[in-house]
Amino acid sequence: MHLPGCAPAMADGSFSLAGHLLRSPGGSTSRLHSIEAILGFTKEDGILDTFPAERSSRSSKERDPRLGAQPACPKAPAGGSESSPPAAPGFVPEYEATRPCYPKEQGEARPSPGLSVGPAAGDSKLSEEEPPKKKHRRNRTTFTTYQLHELERAFEKSHYPDVYSREELAGKVNLPEVRVQVWFQNRRAKWRRQEKLEVSSMKLQDSPLLSFSRSPPSSALAPLGTGPGSGSGPPGSALPLEPWLGPPLPGGGATALQSLPGFGPPGQGLPASYTPPPPFLNSAPLGPGLQQLGPPPAYPCAPAFGDKFSLEEAYPRNSSIAALRLKAKEHIQAIGKPWQAL
């Protein structure tokens, strides 16, 4: 036995419309929600004919899980009264017709129409109670002249004062002990930097390259002929060269060399009993190989060092230094004058 309006409605697809009001056995009224009802379509539009009845009923059950527990066709109540007549097919509630349809994903909770979508009440309370924390910035301590004077005096006595000394000093200069401790730490760091700078500057001053590059004063070089009047360079040269690096001076060097000890003629300063050895290269017993070689070639030597006045007059107390410089001069000239290009 079929109830009127139940099986025919399911057959022609009109069972899924939103306007049907069903009365449950308990007497409460329930409303069916389907995709067509949410979108606002009716049977008269002609769109519902393309969907089968089973598909529309299955989609309505998926959208509203309450339909799964209800029977497809509710039974009539015990009193034998029939179900109330269905409402007009074209009647669609306004809130359902304007609400868009969003597909429900798995694990996603759809909010109820009566609840507002937004952050939870607990989160809003926490955000109101906990304002954003500001970064704590310590104010810089400004020391007075008296405080700096007392701190410097204490630093001269000891770079690492103990806690008792710091507390006593803090009470004396009216500062917290923590500020005094921080000041000593900064002062020790500054002292270490100063020590490193002093050590590095002393090493640079004592290096041989810098001592060699330093030129002697012009007053000491002028008697040796390196001044503008000696003809060794252009007048007014900014960087005078050392005496053994300059070009030789013309003429008159023999008298200056003979005045120094050890630079006299070959026979001077020798005892009377000394006899020079015979020249073995010119002797007869030499073999033919040595005779073909002949005497050794004479290396070109620069003209003798000369000056208008003797070195003893220029350096009355530094004759030994002048002699050493002259020996170095002759040694460089004998090598081949490599420094004259300078």
Swiss-Prot record:
Region (Disordered): 44-140, 208-295
DNA-binding region: 136-195
Main subcellular location of this protein, as a coarse class: nucleus
Intrachain S-S bonds: none
SUPFAM superfamilies according to UniProt: Homeodomain-like
Chain positions of motif OAR: 319-332
Keywords linked to the UniProt accession: Developmental protein, DNA-binding, Homeobox, Nucleus, Transcription, Transcription regulation
Span(s) of short sequence motif Nuclear localization signal: 325-329
Motif Octapeptide motif: positions: 33-40
UniProt xrefs under InterPro entries: HD (IPR001356), Homeobox_CS (IPR017970), Homeodomain-like_sf (IPR009057), OAR_dom (IPR003654), RAX/RAX2 (IPR043562)
Keyword Nucleus found: yes
UniProt function note: Plays a critical role in eye formation by regulating the initial specification of retinal cells and/or their subsequent proliferation. Binds to the photoreceptor conserved element-I (PCE-1/Ret 1) in the photoreceptor cell-specific arrestin promoter.
UniProt record similarity statement: Belongs to the paired homeobox family. Bicoid subfamily.
Protein name, entry field: Retinal homeobox protein Rx
Organism, as annotated: Mus musculus
